C-alpha cells in the first residue's frame, strides 16, 4: 500500500493513488519534508495517470477490445503514433521503461535533483518512521539502488541535451511536473 491504491482499483492496470486516504492519514504532517515529498510523489503519479495516460494511451485485451483489468490487458496503443504495441514490448527497457531512464537523467539535471543525506538523529527518525507504509528494513537498500540507477542515468546523459524519447512527449511531462509541483 505504499502508493495508497484502494481495493476498488487494485485489479486495474491504471491504479491511481487515493490522495484523500493519504491526506486523512498524514495531512496533519504535510509540513514535514518527507511527508510532503511522499505526497508530491503520489500527486505526480495521480496526475501522470489521470492527465497524461488518458490522453496518450489506450489499453486492449487479446481481441483488441478496450480493457482496464491488469491481467487482461494485452496491447497498448500510443495514440499520437497510431501504433499498437504488445504489452510486454511496450513496458520494456526499449520503450516505456527506457524512456523513464532517459527522462530521469534529464529531469535530475534540469531540476538539480539530489538524494538527501539520510543521517538523522533519533527525533528525526521518529518523525520519519511515522510513515508506516514503508518497509524500513528494506528502505536503505531500495534508496541505494535508486540512487545508483539515477547516478548511472545522469552519468551517461549529456547535460542540456534533450533526450530522444520513444513513447513519451517531453514538453507535456515537463509541464505536468511543474503544475504538480505548484500544488504541493
PLM feature spans:
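N-terminal leader/auxiliary helical segments
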Residues: 1-184
Amino acid at each position: 500500500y505504499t502508493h495508497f491504491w484502494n481495493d476498488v482499483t487494485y485489479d486495474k492496470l491504471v491504479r491511481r493513488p487515493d490522495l484523500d486516504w493519504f491526506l486523512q492519514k498524514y495531512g496533519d504532517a504535510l509540513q514535514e519534508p518527507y511527508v510532503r515529498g511522499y505526497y508530491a510523489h503520489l500527486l505526480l503519479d495521480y496526475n501522470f495517470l489521470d492527465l497524461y495516460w488518458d490522453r496518450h494511451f489506450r489499453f486492449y485485451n487479446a481481441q483488441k477490445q478496450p480493457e482496464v483489468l491488469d491481467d487482461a490487458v494485452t496491447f497498448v496503443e500510443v495514440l499520437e503514433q497510431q501504433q499498437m504495441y504488445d504489452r510486454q514490448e511496450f513496458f520494456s527497457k526499449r520503450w516505456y521503461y527506457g524512456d523513464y531512464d532517459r527522462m530521469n537523467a534529464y529531469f535530475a539535471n534540469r531540476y538539480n535533483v539530489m538524494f538527501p543525506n539520510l543521517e538523522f538523529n533519533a527525533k528525526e527518525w521518529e518523525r520519519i518512521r511515522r510513515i508506516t507504509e514503508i518497509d524500513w528494513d528494506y528502505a536503505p537498500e531500495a534508496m541505494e539502488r535508486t540512487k545508483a540507477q539515477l547516478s548511472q542515468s545522469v552519468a551517461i546523459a549529456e547535460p542540456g541535451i534533450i533526450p530522444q524519447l520513444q513513447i513519451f512527449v517531453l514538453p507535456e511531462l515537463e509541464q505536468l511536473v511543474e503544475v504538480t509541483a505548484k500544488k504541493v
